[in-house]
Swiss-Prot record:
PROSITE patterns: RIBOSOMAL_L31 (PS01143). Pfam families: Ribosomal_L31. This is Large ribosomal subunit protein bL31. The keyword RNA-binding applies. Belongs to the bacterial ribosomal protein bL31 family. Type A subfamily. Keywords: Ribonucleoprotein, Ribosomal protein, RNA-binding, rRNA-binding. It comes from Paracoccus denitrificans (strain Pd 1222).
Length: 73
């Protein structure tokens, strides 16, 4: 392998939507940083059967609904 061409691979902490945390190795951030998830298997409709509440992070859902309101879906 060539030296100094690969990103730094280190431990980070991942925080799920329910507050649980775990450590994984990643190239994201710096050693010891915490990645907070907006959507995870506990809250994603594909894994919950659509029973989880849809979160409007940053107003994206509202913007989409307003943009396509006249189509009658």
């Amino acid at each position: 392998m060539k030296a100094d061409i690969h990103p730094d691979y280190h431990l980070i902490e991942v925080k799920m939507t329910d507050g649980t945390t775990y450590q994984v190795r990643s190239t994201w951030g710096k050693e010891g940083d915490t990645m907070s998830l907006d959507i995870d298997p506990n809250s994603h409709p594909a894994w919950t059967g659509g029973s989880a509440k849809l979160m409007d992070t940053g107003g994206r859902v509202s913007k989409f609904k307003n943009k396509y309101a006249g189509l009658g879906f």
